[in-house]
Amino acid sequence: AHLFLKLSDNKNTAYFYDLNTKINYKVNENNNLYLSGYFGRDIFSLSESLTNTYGNSTLNLRWNHLFSDKLFSNVSLIYSDYYYGLDLNFIGFNWESGIKNYNIKYDFKYYLSDKMKLNFGTNLTYFDLNPGTINPLDENSSINFKQLDKKYALETGWFAEMEQTLSEKLNFSYGFRLSTFNRLGNSTVNYYANDQAVVYNEDLKIYEKGTPISTKYFGKNKSIADYVNFEPRATLAYEIDENTSVKASYNRMTQYMQLVSNTASPTPLDVWTPSDNYIKPQLADQIAIGYFKNFSKGDYSLEVESYYKKIKNRI
């Protein structure tokens, strides 16, 4: 993209950079520590009037423990930070938004036999969302500082999955994930008549914001709304020969974060928001079938997959 930008008469630039690091430390025969980090940014500048910067930062500390030759575990502490920035120099302000995640994961692998393996564990994620911050670029700007209310949420999950070899050619895996989600305070919540935050105007044929009938302040970490969802999943794989296999699967997925947009297509100012009283979690049921074949001793492969997905509560 940067090569084509050079052909323009304007001073347009586009570039990105990534930094990765990983450190391993063997404590003893049964314990290992792993530390990894990532920092990346994509930057696009249009004729010095607009600069778009976005990227991710992550830090992961993992402890691997071997209980026996059949059972081991991983404990992970994960921090991630998604940043989005837009400098509108021709107007005189900067827009920033982002999501910070603090995640703890504890998972196990237990080899019950040569033909059965059990995976299970739990995780907890705390979300710190900044929907938007408007900063004037200089003291003479006509734009005033504005901080949209930050949003907080807590998601927990428990999962179990059995991987089973039914025969030399047939493998079956099945399990579930049980997730809970809490939208947390520190914010004031509006309440609307008939719980309708958005109403349809029959005369204008458009949706309009509802009129609040009351408000309530929720203190920090107080629960505003909560959800519980059961997510089953199963996969059946059959090996026709050493180079050919077919697979069928079903799984249910829950997404508690939704992308809010004022338009039909994504824009730079779209923001992520957690589920609450009025924005329900997005649920998806998916069925998939696939055909896989290797050629020339694995140098080439053919993969054909088809799926049907039913989505509920999408906004």
Each language-model region and where it sits:
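Outer-membrane beta-barrel domain signature, strongest for Gram-negative TonB-dependent receptors
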Residues: 14-133, 299-303
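Extracellular loop and loop/strand-boundary signature of outer-membrane beta-barrel proteins
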Residues: 5-10, 44-50, 58-62, 86-96, ...
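Outer-membrane beta-barrel signature, preferentially recognizing the C-terminal barrel domain
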Residues: 52-54, 58, 62-66, 105, ...
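Transmembrane beta-barrel strands of outer-membrane/channel proteins
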Residues: 1, 35-39, 75-81, 120-126, ...
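Structural signature of outer-membrane beta-barrel domains
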Residues: 1, 30, 40-44, 80-84, ...
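Outer-membrane beta-barrel translocator domains and adjoining extracellular loop/strand segments
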Residues: 3-9, 36-40, 44-52, 85-93, ...
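Residues on the lipid-exposed face of transmembrane beta-strands in outer-membrane beta-barrel proteins
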Residues: 21-25, 61-65, 104-110, 158-164, ...
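Signature of Gram-negative outer-membrane beta-barrel scaffolds
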Residues: 124-241
